[in-house]
C-alpha cells in the first residue's frame, strides 16, 4: 500500500498488479466517504496503527510536518522510508502518546474494532472532543453506489456506512 502527500490531500493506492501494462484502460472511483481532518491547530500528532502496517496513516505525515507539528507513529512494525522527523514508538507506549497528543489518528480493521474500543477505552485521557479520529478499514465492494450495507459499521448510536459516512469517524461516534 503506497501513500504520498499531495497539495490538497494525499494519494493512496495498493500495489499495481503484475498483469497491468502501459495503455491498459482503467475505471476508477473515488474518493468515497469522509477522510481524516487534521486540525490546523494540531501541534502534537499521534498516528496509531492497530494493524500490521501503518501505511493508511502515512498520508497525514507530510501535512502535519508542514504545519510544524511533531509526529509520533505508534505501531508494532515500523515502516521503512519515514521522514527523520517522525518518531516511532511501540504499541506499549500508547498511553504516553495519547496523553501527549492534541490530535490522534487511528487505523483499525472493522474486525478488530472491539480491540480498539477496549484499548482506547482504558486510557486515562484522549485528545479533546473531535481530536481523535478512527479509520475503520472495511470492504466496499459496491464503491458506495448501491447502499449494499457490506461496509456497515456499528457505532455507539447507530449503524453507519463506511462508504458514505466514513471510513473515518470521530472517536466520539466510535467509542
Label the model's feature ranges.
Residues 40, 144-146, 172-173:
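Solvent-exposed, flexible loop/coil residues
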Residues 18-141:
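FNR/FR-type flavoprotein reductase catalytic core
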Residues 14, 30, 165:
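Pocket-edge structural micro-motifs
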